[in-house]
């Protein structure tokens, strides 16, 4: 069995797979301590290998790797940046500046689609990347996600105060808000959907209307109605991780 981890800005996503990437366990952790606590309950699983992708600092990643190697008898593989992987060419002028999670997601998408594709990852930040049919990464965009937009309004606007339960209820409709939570949540979601629509229009122009659309990240479901033909793949980064860090 293989332990896989995607260490993002806010959360650590993990899963244990066997065979053809069949998941036998998994979860989300808000900190290294929470992750270790979750994984401790899985120590009975015969984990023989570990691979991870991290957007954290090198020091933070090294500390996490050390803790993982104490939990399981493994030597963890850590994905690194590259100019090229699996037929995809990194489009950044300084390839090392492209976030590793973005890189693995767009590589995975092209590997699965075998044609031009648009990849939108809706997490704390929202990223969009365009990949041509020949594997050339054209570049992409970054904007705040729902969580960031919401937190910035709460932080910098004194009279905006509401809890997460109110936020969830507010998204039951997109009618004009009649309370602060409704106005903020629906306004942010409409901005997010507008961004997604614009990305699709740009992809059709640059890549052609038959390009494949991939949605991933925690808020992908919030925009799926905007792109009826999109493939929603929560584990897209893990597909790319397997390409970057193959294990026999």
Curated annotation (Swiss-Prot):
Main location: cytoplasm
CDD domains documented for this protein: ASKHA_NBD_PanK-III
Pathway noted in the entry: Cofactor biosynthesis; coenzyme A biosynthesis; CoA from (R)-pantothenate: step 1/5
Pfam hit, one: Pan_kinase
Cofactor details (free text): Monovalent cations. Strong preference for ammonium over potassium.
Function of the molecule: Catalyzes the phosphorylation of pantothenate (Pan), the first step in CoA biosynthesis. Can utilize a wide range of phosphoryl donors other than ATP, and does not discriminate between purine- and pyrimidine-based nucleotides or deoxynucleotides. Is responsible for the resistance of P.aeruginosa to the pantothenamide antibiotics, since it cannot bind and phosphorylate these pantothenate analogs.
HAMAP family for this protein: Pantothen_kinase_3
Name of the protein in question: Type III pantothenate kinase
Species for this entry: Pseudomonas aeruginosa (strain ATCC 15692 / DSM 22644 / CIP 104116 / JCM 14847 / LMG 12228 / 1C / PRS 101 / PAO1)
Gene symbol of the encoding locus: coaX
